[in-house]
């Protein structure tokens, strides 16, 4: 027996348990891993589902904790990507309910902000990992490689993910930062354009409501908004959202008008770009 070669394999209890899950679920290179993404931010949800598909996974996206429970009841899943903050169920509460329902798939928490205490709380609740949004394609692939031992990264054309051309009108605008946005979506222009279109629709829908939203609802929306801003490269809007969040925490509303102005300007730029 070649002991040197044997030593190269990871035989830790965690690795063995993960392999056992893969085989018990029937996951092989001929059956793509089934992954559930739960996120109430439409831009984050769309990107993660699209990126997982490009990475050879069968991804299902839902926008609430209750929908996640329903999806888990319908099929055997290999991995869960669960937003930490959703209006109905999220974080430790959602994972506890999923475990009660019999779902044993490893769970990764996602959030626009993750400090050390929050990561510790999520780990104590049973999450195997946590990732800060926006989650790029390479980071997503690394998570799959760590938690799905039987996942095989699909071969891609070396130029398939490279940015081609530029967003000529948008690149001249201080409202949009194309390089950072393209990097967050793996250099895929079509994906970025689709996400920006979806984001523009959301902003148009929310714009009339921002001035009258209760502070707690506005705070929850701003939390989701920041992840979308990073995926779409809407720099000015991200800065305005962060300032308004700080103002809300101080019980002031002076930054709300600034956010409304940034929303209107961003919508116009996204539609023109």
List where the protein language model places each region.
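The feature encodes the CheY-like receiver
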Residues: 87, 115
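Active-site residues of response regulator receiver
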Residues: 83, 111
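Conserved acidic segment of CheY-like receiver
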Residues: 32-43, 48-52, 80
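Two-component system phosphorelay core
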Residues: 128-129, 135-273
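Short hydrophobic/Thr-rich beta-strand motif most characteristic of the beta2 strand and flanking loop
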Residues: 56-63, 71
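Acidic catalytic/metal-coordinating carboxylates
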Residues: 64, 89-94
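Short amphipathic alpha-helix used as the core "switch/output" element in two-component signaling
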Residues: 70, 92-104
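As written
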Residues: 91, 123-130
């Amino acid at each position: 027996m070649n002991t040197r070669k044997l030593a190269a394999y990871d035989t830790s209890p965690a690795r063995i348990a993960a392999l056992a899950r893969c085989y018990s679920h029937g996951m092989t290179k001929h059956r793509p891993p089934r992954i559930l993404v739960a996120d109430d931010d439409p831009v984050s949800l769309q990107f993660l589902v699209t990126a997982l598909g490009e990475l050879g996974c069968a991804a299902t996206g839902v926008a609430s904790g209750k929908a996640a429970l329903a999806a888990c009841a319908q099929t055997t899943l290999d991995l869960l990507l669960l937003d930490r903050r959703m209006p109905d169920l999220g974080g430790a509460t959602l994972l506890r309910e999923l475990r009660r329902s019999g779902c044993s798939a490893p769970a990764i928490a996602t959030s626009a902000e993750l400090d050390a205490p929050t990561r510790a709380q999520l780990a104590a609740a049973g999450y195997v990992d946590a990732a800060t949004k926006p989650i790029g394609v390479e980071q997503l692939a690394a998570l799959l490689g760590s938690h799905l031992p039987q996942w095989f990264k699909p071969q891609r054309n070396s130029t398939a993910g490279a940015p081609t051309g530029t967003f000529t009108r948008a690149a001249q605008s201080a409202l949009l930062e194309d390089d950072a946005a393209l990097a967050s979506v793996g250099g895929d222009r079509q994906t970025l354009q689709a996400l920006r279109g979806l984001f523009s629709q959301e902003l148009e829908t929310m714009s009339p409501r921002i001035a009258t939203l209760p502070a707690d609802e506005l705070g929850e929306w701003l939390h989701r908004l920041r992840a979308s801003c990073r995926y779409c490269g809407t720099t000015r809007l991200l800065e305005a959202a962060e300032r308004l969040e700080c103002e809300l925490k101080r019980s002031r509303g002076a930054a709300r008008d600034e956010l409304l102005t940034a929303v209107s300007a961003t919508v116009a730029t996204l539609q023109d770009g």
